Amino acid sequence: MSRSNRQKEYKCGDLVFAKMKGYPHWPARIDEMPEAAVKSTANKYQVFFFGTHETAFLGPKDLFPYEESKEKFGKPNKRKGFSEGLWEIENNPTVKASGYQSSQKKSCAAEPEVEPEAHEGDGDKKGSAEGSSDEEGKLVIDEPAKEKNEKGTLKRRAGDVLEDSPKRPKESGDHEEEDKEIAALEGERPLPVEVEKNSTPSEPDSGQGPPAEEEEGEEEAAKEEAEAQGVRDHESL
């Protein structure tokens, strides 16, 4: 009982070995407790870990006096920062960490049991990431197949076009020859028509009309003269 009472009476600056889940008994120091954390962490001390410079809140049952437990818990350990912590607690027990490191590592060290859950969450995330990668892999596999099918159809269409293309020039060539022949015929036909059209209006201008009328007048005059002579001959008889 005297030992437990003595543990509960730790003061700021006392050197101890602190035990956390997943970690060996670590050289540490009782640090000052912030006033805001006193109510929420009743009967717990803010502990500063040498070597790693992390902080955590631990109860008296997890704290052991350094001098009494040095032979038991002060053996060398391969854990990172442990040997540095033993050196600091002996040679530089008043070392302090920066506020950023202490506040950041406090949350990490205060809840070590949560770390496995975090790892499980990471595992789930990794699983989901792997699942998504598998899905992406399927999508990637399907896309080349679609591209191959599309390329095949394009090749077939291109082949059909190439097969049709030699035929079309021939047909177009025949049509062109026919068009040329028709154009040549049409070009020949309008020429006489134009000549006729041009000749028709020229007839009145040439003066052929009036000479015909004069001939008719002369014939009539000749008939009249012949009749007159006949009358004269008859009278003379």
From Swiss-Prot:
Changing S128A: Does not affect secretion. CDD domains: PWWP_HDGF. SUPFAM superfamilies: Tudor/PWWP/MBT. Residues 91-106 have a biased composition (Polar residues). Residues 12-69 form the PWWP domain. Sumoylated with SUMO1. Sumoylation prevents binding to chromatin. Expressed predominantly in testis and skeletal muscle, to intermediate extents in heart, brain, lung, liver, and kidney, and to a minimal extent in spleen. The modification Phosphoserine is found at S128, S132, S133, S165, S199, S202, S206, S236. It comes from the Eukaryota. Pfam families: PWWP (PF00855). Residues 69-237 are annotated as: Disordered. Disulfide bonds join C12-C108. Changing S165A: Abolishes secretion. InterPro entries: PWWP_dom, PWWP_HDGF. Signal peptide: none annotated. Residues 116-128, 135-173, 181-197, 223-237 have a biased composition (Basic and acidic residues). GO terms for cellular component: cytoplasm; extracellular space; nucleus. Monomer, and domain-swapped homodimer. Interacts with nuclear proteins NCL and YBX1/YB1. Acts as a transcriptional repressor. Has mitogenic activity for fibroblasts. Heparin-binding protein. This is Hepatoma-derived growth factor.
